[in-house]
């Protein structure tokens, strides 16, 4: 979606990802160049940043895989970020680096007064958040124009099996963000000079601010699953979901176009379509 958005506005795009990835719909398309490589390998990173005007850094080892091997996670998420910064400082010093971080870096804020603001201290609850905090520090120190985006959990309106245990408590504050709104935020961060040098929360906004129980109840009602079957994260286990201050990010990027209600409507339509097939 991000590539399509860039191309739709007339920008040429270079996609850099692992050789094992599926590049269908990208390779051979006008205005799209595919570079296969690994961010832990400096030579291919140097090749990837040649002649670019902006970099969207999305590459990372994500949970749950990131929790299995700390060294591998830090090698990819932190050392990979170092390689991108060094390559840009050497070959693309005028290009903007937009770094995709996470609201999980705030740690457990359940006992605090919402919303969580970007000035809030960061406390890693897992290796992934640890890697993002370390990478943010590197990005802030880079001799480049940079943007830090701390992104909330992403909601995609497609039919998925509920997880065995939802990763939040029933009472926990929860604010996610629609996938297409994330794409809009990412794209606009690349082309909006006013956001350079800033750290911004990217989340759904007031219509998405709900509780863990209500979020699950809404989904189970659409899926036709009895709410008695739900299992939430234990009360004694720390978690990072909350409500977020997105006033500045919305003012600068104008990305919150899909309300929570519209997301539920799209999900319901998807379920009805699948049942009709």
Report residues per predicted region.
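Canonical Rossmann dinucleotide-binding motif of NAD(H)/NADP(H)-dependent dehydrogenases/reductases
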Residues: 1-11
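NAD(P)H-binding glycine-rich loop region in Rossmannoid oxidoreductase-like domains
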Residues: 32, 36-76
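Glycine-rich NAD(P)-binding loop of the Rossmann-fold in SDR/ketoreductase-type enzymes
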Residues: 40, 68, 72-83, 122, ...
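Catalytic helix-loop patch of NAD(P)-dependent Rossmann-fold dehydrogenases
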Residues: 75, 110-148
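Conserved Rossmann-fold NAD(P)-dependent oxidoreductase catalytic core, especially the SDR/UDP-sugar
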Residues: 79-125
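Glycine/proline-rich active-site loop of Rossmann-fold NAD(P)-dependent oxidoreductases
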Residues: 133, 156-167, 188-200
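Substrate-positioning beta->alpha
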Residues: 148-150, 167-190, 198
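Mid/C-terminal beta-alpha module of Rossmann-like enzyme folds, strongest
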Residues: 185-246, 251-252, 263-265, 271-275
């Amino acid at each position: 979606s991000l590539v399509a958005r860039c191309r739709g506005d007339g920008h040429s795009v270079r996609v850099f990802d692992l050789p094992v990835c599926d590049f269908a719909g990208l390779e051979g398309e006008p205005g799209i160049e595919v570079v296969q490589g690994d961010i832990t390998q400096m030579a291919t990173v140097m090749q990837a940043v040649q002649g670019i005007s902006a970099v969207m850094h999305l590459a990372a080892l994500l949970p749950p895989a990131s929790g299995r091997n700390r060294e591998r996670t830090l090698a990819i998420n932190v050392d990979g970020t170092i390689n991108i910064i060094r390559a840009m400082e050497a070959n693309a010093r005028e290009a903007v680096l937009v770094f995709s971080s996470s609201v999980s870096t705030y740690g457990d804020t359940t006992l605090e007064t919402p919303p969580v603001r970007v000035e809030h201290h960061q406390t890693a609850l897992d290796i992934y958040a640890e890697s993002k905090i370390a990478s943010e520090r590197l990005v802030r120190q880079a001799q480049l124009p940079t943007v830090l985006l701390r992104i909330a959990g992403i909601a995609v309106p497609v039919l998925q099996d509920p997880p065995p245990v939802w990763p939040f408590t029933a009472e926990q504050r929860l604010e996610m963000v629609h996938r297409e709104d994330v794409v809009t935020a990412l794209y606009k961060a690349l082309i909006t000079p006013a956001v350079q040098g800033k750290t911004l929360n990217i989340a759904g906004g007031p219509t998405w601010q709900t509780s863990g129980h209500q979020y699950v109840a809404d989904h189970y009602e659409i899926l036709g699953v009895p709410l008695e079957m739900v299992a939430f994260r234990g009360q004694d286990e720390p978690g990072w979901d909350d409500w977020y201050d997105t006033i500045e990010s919305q003012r600068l990027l104008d990305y919150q176009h899909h309300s929570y209600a519209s997301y539920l409507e799209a999900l319901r339509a998807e379920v009805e379509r699948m049942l009709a097939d």
